[in-house]
Amino acid sequence: MRAIGSVPDEPTAASVWQCVAGSTIDDHLLEWPPDVFALTETLLERSEAYRFALSPPDDAEWPPSEVPRWPDAVVEAGREWSRWAEDRHGPIPDLLAREWKILRDAIDGPFTDLRQAHNWRLCSALLTLHAIADEACAGLGVALDASHEDGVRYRVRGRELLARTGSLARIPAHRLRVLPKIRTADGGSSVRALSRYASVHSPGVELQWHKVPSRPQGTPLYDKGVNYLLLPWPLRVRESDFRPRPESVQRLASETFGYFEFVPSEGLDLDLVDRMLVAALDEVPSVRVVVLPESAVDRDEIDDLEALLTRHGVVGLITGVRARPNRPGQFPGNWVHLGLWTGEQWVHIKQSKHHRWSLDESQIHQYHLGGALHPHVRWWEAMEVPQRSLQLIEVGEGATVVSLVCEDLAQIDHVADMIRSVGPTIVVTPLLDGPQLSARWSARYASVLADDPGSAVLTLTSYGMVQRSRPPGRNSSAVVALWKNPGKGIREISLEAGAQGILLSASTDRAMRRTADGRWPVDNGSELFDISVYQVRAAKTGSGLAYQRTGSTAPPMLDTSELTILSCWAEAVADALAFAPEQLEAVRADALADAPWRAELGLPKPSGELNQAISRMFREARTAMDTGREPPLDAVILAVRATHVGSPGLDQLVCRVLRSAVEQRRNRRPTVGEALPSTDERPVRPAELPPQNERAG
C-alpha cells in the first residue's frame, strides 16, 4: 500500500483509459469505431494534446506531411473502416493499422509524452486516429449525406444501439457515452472543435435519443419551412395564482425560507386555441408546432389539446406542464411535454425540469407578489427534483430539438455540457418569467448556445407574467419571446394589443460542418433560422370540429424507443435502395430478431410488435423492388402510398415511417461529403483563418 503523501506512479495512456473505461487498450476496440473515438478523445482531452492540431510544436507540422493528402486519407479510411466493421473480413485500412500500431506500442509510456509532445509521432497518430474514428461515426446519428453504400448495416446497428442504451459505444454508459454530433461551432479551441460527427460525455446525465417521423402528410419535399404558433398564456396571471405551500416556512440560521406553488385560477381555453388556429391557418397553409410557456397546461388537459391540434393538422406540441401531487406530502410536477403526431398516434416525450425557481425580495417586488408571498422569506418553487436527463428528438432532414425549462437554461452543468457537445438544431425553452429582453438573463444564455455549438434558441414566457413584471421606475413590456440565430442578432418578439398569439415562421437549410484538425468542411449539417413574425388575433368563430377525446386514450402501437428503432431500419432500407439495392436482403437479415450482432452488442431482441413492424416494412420494400420500376426509391414511395390507404393501424404506421425515410433520402442532393474535393490545396488551420465577429453585447 502506498503511503499517504508519497509520489504516485507516472500515469500512462493505458492507466488513464483503465481508470475511465475499466478496460484495456487492445485490438478488440477496433471492432467498433465509436469505441476508438472514445479512447482517442479521452486521451487527447486528458493530456491536452488536442491543442497540437491547433498549434503544433516548433519542430513539427500538422496535418502531417508523411500522410499524403491527409484530409482525404482520413475520410477514406473512415469509410473503409465502417464497411469492414460490418463483417470484419480482411484487413483494416492501412492508415488505421499504421497509426494504431504507433499508439499500441506507446500505451505504457509516460503520459507526459503526450502532454508535452515529447513523442510527436504518438501525438500525430492519436490525432489521426481520432479523425478517422470521427469519420467512421458519420451517419450513426443523423443519417444525412454522410450515408453512403459503405457500412449501411454498421450504421443501423449503431443507431439501434443508441436508441437502446443512449450511447454509440459498447463501453458501459455509466462510465462514458459517445453521442452523435449535430452542429459544430465555427470557432473554439477545445477538444470539441476536433470532431463533427461524434462527441464523448462523462457519466451523470441520462440521455434518450428519439427519432420520430413527424413531417405532415402531403408536405412538398422542397418545403423547408416550419410555422410555430406561440401562445404566451396565461394572458393574465393573478397574485393569488402564487400560493405558499402550507406549513413550509422554516428558519435556517438567520435565513427564512419556504415553498410556493403556481396554480393558475383558470384552465386552458380550448375554444380560444381552436379560434387561434383558425386565424393562423388563414395566414399560412399549415402550423407545424404549437408552443406554450412553462406550467401553462395541466397534465389532464394534454389529451384534449392534442386531439384539437390533430384536427387542424398540427404535428408538434411543446408546452410546459404542471401536475398536482399524487399523494399527500409530495411536491407538484413541472416538466416540458413534447408531443409528436406520427399520423397514427401521438408520441409523448417528457423533459424534466432540474432546477427550482427561487424568488427573493427583489423579485417579489418586481412581480408584485408581496400580498401572497412575504418579501422577507426566500421562496423556493415546490417541485420534485428528478434525476438529470436529456431528451433529444430527431424530427427529420437532420433537424433535432431539445427543450429546457426556465432555470435549466441558466445552469452551467452536465446537461449544458451535453447540449454544447451534441449541438441540437434548436433549443426551445418555455419560461415563467418576465419580458424576454435582449438585456436580461435568458438572452445572455441563449447567446451562449447560439455561439457554441450554434443552435437556434427560442424562449417563450406568459404575457400575464410579462405584465406583472414592473421593476421600480420601469414600464411594463410586451416582449414575450426571444429568438436567437447562430451568428446573428437577437429578435425580441412582442405581443401586440388585441393579439393572443404569434406566428413565427422559420426555415431549415444546409449548414457547414467544420473541424479544427485540418479536414475539409462539408455541407451536410442543418440550421434553422427565423423568417417572419405575424400577430394572431383569434377568429370570431371556431372550426366547428369536435376535439374532446371520447373515452380513454388508446395505448400507442409502439413506444418511443420502438418507434425510434423502426425509423432507424427505415433509414437503412432507404440507404440500401439509394446506394446498393443488392444489399437489401443482407440488411433484412440483420433486422431479424435472432440476428447475432445484437447479442454481440448486448442488445435485447425486438418485441413482438416491433419485429412485426420491421418485417412488414421489408416486405413492402421487397414488393416494390419486384415491380421492376426505376429508380427503387420512387418504386417504394408509390407502393407505400397504395398500401397506406385503408390498412390497419400498425401497417399504416409502418408505411408512413418508411415513406418518410425514403422521401428524405430521395430529396437529398450530392454534397461535398459524398464527392471529396479534388484540389491539391492543403486545408487552412484555424489559426490562419480571419477572426470571427464578436457577439454583439
What residues fall within each predicted segment?
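CN hydrolase (nitrilase-like) catalytic-core segments centered on the catalytic cysteine
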Residues: 5-132, 140, 302-319, 329, ...
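Long, compositionally biased intrinsically disordered regions
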Residues: 28-31, 39-46, 53, 63-80, ...
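Long, charge-dense tracts
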Residues: 52-236, 240-256, 293
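Active-site catalytic loop in hydrolytic enzyme cores
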Residues: 196-221, 329-422
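Short, compositionally biased "basic patch" segments
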Residues: 219-272, 360, 365, 374-391, ...
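Structural motif
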Residues: 231-234, 288-289, 294-296, 316, 399-401, 404-408, 425-426, 430-433
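Cys-nucleophile CN-hydrolase/nitrilase-fold catalytic domain and related Cys-dependent amidase chemistry
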Residues: 267-354, 442-447, 451, 600-612, ...
